[in-house]
Amino acid sequence: MFGIFRNKNSNYNVSAKKRVAYCIGINDYPGTRNDLRGCVNDAIDWASLTQVHGYTADIIKDRDATVSLGKNILKELVNDSNKYGKDFQGILTFSGHGTHVPDLDGDEENGRDEALCMYDGLIIDDEIREILSSFNKNARLWIVADCCHSGTITRNFLETLYDEELKAKPRYMPPSDDLLALMNIRQKSYIVRPQEEDMNEILLTGSLDSEYSWDAFIDGKFQGAMSYHAKKIIRNNPGITFDKLHAEVRKFLPSRQFPQTPQLEGREQNKVLKIF
């Protein structure tokens, strides 16, 4: 189903804790003309980085990254958090397209729900919040979402918005007409959007929801602009905290080449924790 990445160079003793990382990368979006190039590289790199720090890392890519598997991963993280409590540390990274759909439960000020584009469909942010609402607050979960959810772009424009010279492309997928029709008849879930202090996870995103997160050719290979800087900063500062990582990433982004503004969300007491 998906590959388990193991690094024999890990110097961490994980016997006392359960550390797991699920690293999702989707380049292939069949039938959309919106394939990406750097998302699988992101997943491999995040897996390598987390494994060095004592995590068992699973790489999920392209056709394996289905909606059902994505939801099962979230549920597994919740189950482990309740089984191991404070001894559990989970990481979930997602590199791929993001999109938006009409907000039917009134929890979004902009009238749109954000969604992750899996290989075969969408996982709506409401669904993610509902699953994670049962996550043990004594455990820890870091989510990295290197995708974008901007609703300011049209289908026709997106097809031409690819800079061959810069080899950069936004990680945004417009929702299909069929999907929008389906969402319009979806039953309301009445999920309340949580405040940061109520979040069970620490969330690092590639951009504001009004911006693009860029898939770009950097240092000889395709990768996410935000992921590139975040991974490099962590490697150079292994004891860095979440808030300091965000501050360091913001020194590089937004830039003229990549006008995206990474965001950090979560409880304040969690933001000052060391990542590893």
Stretch-by-stretch model annotation:
Residues 1-276:
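Cysteine endopeptidase catalytic domains of the caspase/legumain-like
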